[in-house]
Amino acid sequence: MLALIFFIFGPMSGTRYKILRAARLLFNEHGVAKVSQRTISDHIAISPGNLTYHFKKRDDIIEALYFDLVEAMNESFALVEKSEPSFELLYELTRSVNKNLFDNRFFMIDFIQILRSNDKIKKHYVG
């Protein structure tokens, strides 16, 4: 999953990782509409300029989290393709997918809003 972020957005610095982790937490707690770049920078005690250096817009943060989720889901399903079918495999797939969705629950809650406001995610999702 980090490999995809590296491919799309470049190498991940410690600050970049902290921003994404904080944004995910705040989006999950408060919803996308109530979290600004300032909220995120305040949460991790960095300047707004430092956050903007890594992510020009809030949508860039949402995109990074979206593609991180996509990669995590792809990894979950890749396990199925490489293995013999079994109840254990079905359990592991279900657990993994549910964990990914729970860890990024703001996408499920605010998905319509995200699709309406973010053309890059909409294009990827719709195909």
What are these regions (language model features)?
Residues 67-74:
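Short, basic, alpha-helical segments at the C-terminal edge of helix-turn-helix-like DNA-binding modules
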Residues 43, 68, 96, 110-114:
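Short acidic/histidine-centered micro-motifs embedded in hydrophobic/aromatic stretches
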Residues 1-14, 25:
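N-terminal intrinsically disordered/low-complexity leader segments
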Residues 18, 26, 30-60, 64:
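Helix-turn-helix
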Residues 102-127:
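Short secondary-structure transition hinges
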Residues 13-20, 63, 67, 84-91, ...:
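Non-membrane alpha-helical structural segments and their capping/turn regions in soluble enzymes
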Residues 64, 78-110:
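Hydrophobic alpha-helical connector segments
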